[in-house]
């Protein structure tokens, strides 16, 4: 049965203003029709078309050259979007990992002692996901080429009076407390340093603190878990087979462009970032904006305007990639773009 919905003048007066509808999906009427099996009144289609054209004009373009409709901008998260509070007060919005929620995958992996390796570009959400999964329980080590055993295990420090006192490192603290440990940028740490973690990740579940005989052998309590993150394209990254074999769950993390739009990142900025991501994959550039940069763009644009936000993003890009980045943003926004200067 076909139902016609009539929009009379009274209902028109109750409709939100154009600015409110501008943030909505331009195909909202069609989507509703598909969902409830109704034929909506042509007046509503006309109104929705008008809103879509207004959205194009708000971006300073004609309807014909507006952002493609398959990539609409919206700041409204759906009601079923799950989000988890991170220790810093920000929210992490979950993503699908196959048929599962990514936060729940990490929690189940910890319960089953299936160590996890996340890899992807900086800013794509690796650390945010781990913090969302484990919250205040999490211990973290930020790796580099200068990371030493003492940065993981602990070491002696001298007090003002001259005495030396031993302080446990994050690896020992996490093991004894039965908490998760994130080794961030693990690929930059020397494999000889990382070998100290092996005993706590295999059946032994223990580590002998040779630097402090008084500490002796530390045994991991139930709940101890190791998760690592790395950027495989960073210079100097190396992961031994012995280490990789211990991470039975491995996944590449990428920026969720759809989520970026839902979080209010302007569609032109997302489209430009996607274009750069394709060029990054093709080896034409070494950098593309990820979720972190896009959310910063969103916030800065609200304060300083679009042109300023674009210039700031260009200034954050690697110098060797700036001509390509500037070209893409110039074509996307329809005006010349250059990095910020003072």
Residue ranges of each PLM-predicted region?
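C-terminal regulatory/interaction module of P-loop NTP-utilizing enzymes
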Residues: 1-342
